[in-house]
Amino acid sequence: MRKQFLIAYRGYSSIAPENTKLAFQAAQVFDFDGIWIDIQLTKDKQIVVTHKENFKVSNKNLNLNQINLVDLKKVNLASEFKLKVTSQQIQTLKEVLTQFIQPFKYLLIHIKDDKENNNSLLEQLNLLCKDFVLAKEKMILLSSNFHIIKLINETFKGFKTGFVIANKKALLVASRDELMRYCRFLVPNESFYHKNCKEIQNLGLPVILWVIKGLLRYQFYENDRFVKFQITAQIY
């Protein structure tokens, strides 16, 4: 039995294209406790699951906010993957929640920072979450923008949040009291946490750690009482 929750980074992305239905299905088959996914808005204000900010559509390289969902669905996300797999369409967040909120223990939703669309994305996300009774229980909303974390607390009553941090500069945007008030988790990347674990632990919040690479690192953090989730592209 695992000591912590093991979360598949953008799905089981070492064996399937990241942030695709196939990657999420693989994570389910291999018994991950949940998935980490990234969300952004399309031109027509649809929440889609992707880390990428631009796509080639009709032989043109376009930013995501220039593409409507119907055209984005034509892109094969598996075309450049290292293994030959079936064609994969981009997924809307609604499609992912419909299929995967039930079987997984947790869905970690990373809200990509886009100053032009942050408010619209949060409005759409808030409406969507109301359609899923398990949303508050199973979703953890993540952002590297502390302003977004505060907005989530104001508009998403009862939802768990995690502040994504990669360096000391990120820790300076909020006081310890603000972090305790607005965040349920701190979400440092592994290399930053490894070098600054005492400072982060002194903030007093549980940790979601990303991205773990290698069995030895995974086993090392198993004994860290602050680490509650390990995010990885491998099964351990």
Curated annotation (Swiss-Prot):
Record's keyword terms, sorted: Hydrolase
An annotated Gene Ontology molecular function: phosphoric diester hydrolase activity
Gene3D superfamilies according to UniProt: Phosphatidylinositol (PI) phosphodiesterase
GO process terms (BP): lipid metabolic process
Record bears the keyword Cell wall biogenesis/degradation: no
Residues covered by the GP-PDE domain: 4-236
Coiled-coil regions listed: none
Keyword Membrane: no
SUPFAM superfamilies hit by this protein: PLC-like phosphodiesterases (SSF51695)
Family indicated by similarity: To glycerophosphoryl diester phosphodiesterases (EC 3.1.4.46). To M.genitalium MG293.
Protein name per its UniProtKB record: Uncharacterized protein MG385
